[in-house]
């Protein structure tokens, strides 16, 4: 298996970032760091210009708004990473160190080797799958105009040129060389969007899966704790478990803190995107190409939301299971002093570790709620038509 978070690290390095935790200016942002942010923000102008230019055509407006919202969400993700760049790299190093310790003979981690190894395989697979999904969606947008031009030339007919994204520039963007320049600009924006989505979203689900594995490791340690034992051994074991639990809770809260803007943006913007994309799906039922385009786009944005909801769900569930692990252990054989310490662990683990932003909680229940809303919108729009 490759290095932990390797794909996400490659995406970040492609965007000009590097692991500079030890650098004296690790908190400073240079032009290369913010160039991607400026580049993506600049794409809002031609997108909004397109909406304004076609304001009387609801189909074109909704088609463009779905891209506008995606671009806005990418701006939030880039800003989140730039603002918390050092924290991101610290968490990457922390989990890599914990993974190395799980393969060593350190007692705290040795018992959870299977959990951590399987978690890292799953995180690596999901990261690659998500990156491929985002890449294929972007590629589909890019190839659409090229395929259309190729088909027209094959049949010896003429057709109007189209940009990959619905954009309107302040110059003639449908004739050479303006068309080629705008096409290249759109491709570069798409590459940045895909790279940051793969990195930021991929890191979140990888962090969440690793946290779940370590919570499971902690549960196993508690359940397998053999009582009674000598007082020194008991204190060493208890100290190790408490420190491990505190570390996992700290990492969970840190994850929630640095991803708060992204979770908020993900829920708000996905809710808006669902409305406009469902409208496009329903109104383009007769066009197979358009239907495939918007169906893949819809699947991509729902996958992004699912990543956060699933990650939040597994962290919440496994953090609560520590309470169950203590109750399933042979705690009744422990000394009164140890029982008191175990009761404190129970109290601490009964507090839900929620990944939330405002009143939005990243959970599968909320994801299902948005899916139900999407189905209701389909029924509503079809009934109106």
UniProtKB/Swiss-Prot annotation:
The keyword Transmembrane helix applies. One of its GO terms (molecular function) is olfactory receptor activity. Keywords: Cell membrane, Membrane, Olfaction, Receptor, Sensory transduction, Transducer, Transmembrane, Transmembrane helix. The keyword Plastid does not apply. It is a multi-pass membrane protein. The chain crosses the membrane at residues 33-53, 63-83, 132-152, 187-207, 258-278, 291-311, 358-378. One of its GO terms (cellular component) is extracellular space. Residues 54-62, 153-186, 279-290, 379-385 are extracellular. It holds the Pfam family 7tm_6. Belongs to the insect chemoreceptor superfamily. Heteromeric odorant receptor channel (TC 1.A.69) family. Or1a subfamily. This is Odorant receptor 82a. The gene is Or82a.
């Amino acid at each position: 298996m490759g290095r932990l978070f390797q794909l996400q690290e490659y995406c970040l390095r492609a965007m000009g970032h590097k692991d500079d935790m030890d650098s004296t200016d690790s908190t400073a942002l240079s032009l290369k760091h913010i160039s991607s942010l400026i580049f993506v923000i600049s794409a809002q102008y031609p997108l909004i210009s397109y909406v304004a230019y076609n304001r009387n055509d609801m189909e074109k407006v909704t088609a463009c708004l779905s891209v506008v919202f995606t671009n806005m969400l990418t701006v939030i993700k880039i800003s989140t990473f730039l603002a918390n760049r050092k924290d991101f790299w610290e968490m990457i190093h922390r989990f890599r160190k914990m993974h190395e310790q799980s393969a060593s003979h350190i007692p705290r981690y040795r018992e959870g080797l299977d959990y951590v190894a399987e978690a890292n395989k799953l995180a690596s697979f999901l990261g690659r799958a998500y990156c491929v999904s985002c890449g294929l969606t972007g590629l589909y947008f890019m190839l659409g105009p090229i395929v259309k031009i190729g088909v027209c030339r094959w049949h010896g007919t003429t057709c109007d040129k189209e940009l990959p994204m619905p954009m309107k520039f302040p110059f003639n963007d449908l004739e050479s060389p303006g068309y080629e320049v705008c096409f290249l600009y759109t491709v570069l924006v798409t590459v940045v969007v895909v790279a940051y989505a793969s990195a930021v979203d991929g890191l979140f689900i990888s962090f969440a899966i690793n946290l779940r594995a370590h919570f499971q490791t902690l549960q196993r340690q508690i359940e397998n704790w053999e009582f009674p034992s000598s007082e020194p051994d008991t204190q060493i074991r208890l100290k190790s478990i408490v420190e491990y639990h505190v570390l996992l809770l700290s990492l969970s809260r840190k994850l929630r803190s640095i991803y708060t803007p992204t979770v908020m943006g993900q829920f708000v913007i996905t809710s808006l995107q669902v409305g406009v994309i469902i409208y496009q799906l329903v109104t383009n039922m007769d066009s197979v190409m358009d239907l495939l385009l918007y169906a893949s786009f819809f699947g991509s944005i729902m996958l992004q939301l699912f990543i956060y909801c699933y990650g939040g769900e597994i962290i919440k569930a496994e953090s609560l299971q520590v309470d169950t692990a203590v109750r399933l252990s042979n705690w009744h054989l422990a000394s009164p002093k140890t029982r008191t310490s175990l009761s404190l662990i129970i109290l601490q683990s009964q507090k839900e570790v929620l990944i939330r932003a405002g009143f939005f909680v990243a959970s599968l229940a909320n994801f299902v709620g948005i899916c139900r809303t999407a189905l209701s919108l389909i029924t509503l729009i079809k009934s109106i038509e």
